[in-house]
Amino acid sequence: MLEGAKLIGAGAATIALAGAAVGIGNVFSSLIHSVARNPSLAKQLFGYAILGFALTEAIALFALMMAFLILFVF
């Protein structure tokens, strides 16, 4: 019973990974649209896009860490 609850909890914790994937897609989609409109700002916008990617990916890594904690620690 407890093992099944752990698996369900870990699966629920990984739902955030799908949201992070959508967020990363939005970051780079916005980058492509912005560079297409104003190519002279490409270098500056790329820095902002990498920052957005890193922050979004951090949320995904925290969610994955929670899933592993649920599976192997509790």
UniProtKB/Swiss-Prot annotation:
Location of the protein in the cell: Mitochondrion membrane
**Gene3D superfamilies according to UniProt:** F1F0 ATP synthase subunit C
Q: What does this protein do?
A: This protein is one of the chains of the nonenzymatic membrane component (F0) of mitochondrial ATPase.
Q: Please verify whether the record's keywords include rRNA processing.
A: no
| Species | Oryza sativa subsp. indica
User: How is this protein positioned relative to the membrane?
Assistant: Multi-pass membrane protein
Q: What is this protein called?
A: ATP synthase subunit 9, mitochondrial
Q: Where are the transmembrane segments?
A: 8-28, 53-73
Concerning CDD domains, the annotation shows: ATP-synt_Fo_c_ATP5G3 (cd18182)
